[in-house]
């Protein structure tokens, strides 16, 4: 059965055991208090993307033993903790390591979290070329992924349907002022005619991945395409002007001229 702790103890839980000790002879010194503390901590980075689990053992306000999931074992902080460290590493180490998942991760996922942590923002994806396009010349494709939340995201490059792993680099996650993130993922490549490059983005806010394509083409083909688009735009403009002028010319009143103009 998975070990569970209340949600209020996710970041810090303190169990204080008061052990009262009195002298063995009657009428001796007044009773003395000895305080033993056990403090477990769960540290989260970007949700559950990275979790660190730390437990501290304290005797009379002095830490003597610690477990840190980044270290992976119990370590004595003072000489007092050395026997306990050896014993716990033999008897409880695997169970304590598992508590990173059974305690920290489990409670994070099961506990009601603030609205800001439940927020989902879908990324915007745009592909651009770092330099003017030229076939058979080294270049860099940039996949700009912006305005997404939470931070967990996976961006991959494909060429003609095959994933590219060589020549891929990425910036660190960049925080925006509205809590969203952005990242740039670059692909060093040499474009050749007919090749199709795809930026593939996976994110918790998406039901299915976003894929944006970029196709390599020659300058002449690009010029013809731009000329065709320009011709279509001009055609639409002139057609609109013609219809407007025709409509205006038909709006005037019809009928006989005014009587004063008759000879």
Curated annotation (Swiss-Prot):
Q: Organism, per UniProt? A: Mus musculus (Mouse)
Decide whether keyword Glycoprotein is in the record. yes
Q: How does it sit in the membrane?
A: Single-pass type I membrane protein
- Keyword tags: Adaptive immunity, Disulfide bond, Glycoprotein, Immunity, Membrane, MHC II, Signal, Transmembrane, Transmembrane helix
Q: Which Pfam families match?
A: C1-set, MHC_II_beta
Residues linked to a glycan: 46
**Stored PANTHER family:** HLA CLASS II HISTOCOMPATIBILITY ANTIGEN, DQ BETA 1 CHAIN, MHC CLASS II-RELATED
Q: What is this protein called?
A: H-2 class II histocompatibility antigen, A-U beta chain
Tell me the superkingdom of the source. Eukaryota
- Matching CDD domains: IgC1_MHC_II_beta_HLA-DQ_I-A
Principal cellular location given in the protein's record: membrane
In this chain, the stretch annotated as Beta-1 covers 28-120
The Gene Ontology CC terms held by the record are:
cell surface; early endosome; Golgi apparatus; late endosome membrane; lysosomal membrane; MHC class II protein complex; multivesicular body
Q: Does the record bear Disulfide bond in its keywords?
A: yes
Molecular function in Gene Ontology: MHC class II protein complex binding; peptide antigen binding
Q: Which residues lie on this side of the membrane: Extracellular?
A: 28-224
One annotated GO biological process: peptide antigen assembly with MHC class II protein complex
Q: Which SMART domains match?
A: IGc1 (SM00407), MHC_II_beta (SM00921)
Q: Where does the record place the Ig-like C1-type domain?
A: 123-211
């Amino acid at each position: 059965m998975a070990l569970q702790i209340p949600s209020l103890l996710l970041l810090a839980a303190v169990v204080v055991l008061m052990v009262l000790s009195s002298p063995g002879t009657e009428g001796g010194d007044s009773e003395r208090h000895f305080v033993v503390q056990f403090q477990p901590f769960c540290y989260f980075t970007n949700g559950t993307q990275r979790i660190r689990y730390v437990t501290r053992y304290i005797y009379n306000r002095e830490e003597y033993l610690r477990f840190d999931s980044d270290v992976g074992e119990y370590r004595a902080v003072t000489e007092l903790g050395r026997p306990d460290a050896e014993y716990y590493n033999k008897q409880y180490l695997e169970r304590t390591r598992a508590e990173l998942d059974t305690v920290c991760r489990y409670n994070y996922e099961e506990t009601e979290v603030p609205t800001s942590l439940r927020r989902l923002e879908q990324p915007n994806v745009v592909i651009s070329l770092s330099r003017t396009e030229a076939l058979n010349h080294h270049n860099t494709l940039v996949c700009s992924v912006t305005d997404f939340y939470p931070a967990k995201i996976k961006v991959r490059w494909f060429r003609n349907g095959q994933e590219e792993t060589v020549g891929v680099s990425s910036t660190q996650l960049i925080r925006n002022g509205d809590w969203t993130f952005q990242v740039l993922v670059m692909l060093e490549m040499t474009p050749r005619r007919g090749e199709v490059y795809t930026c593939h983005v996976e994110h918790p806010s998406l039901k299915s991945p976003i894929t944006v394509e970029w196709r390599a083409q020659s300058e002449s083909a690009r010029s013809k395409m731009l000329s065709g688009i320009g011709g279509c735009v001009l055609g639409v403009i002139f057609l609109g002007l013609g219809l407007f002028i025709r409509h205006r010319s038909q709006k005037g009143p019809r009928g006989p001229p005014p009587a004063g103009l008759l000879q």
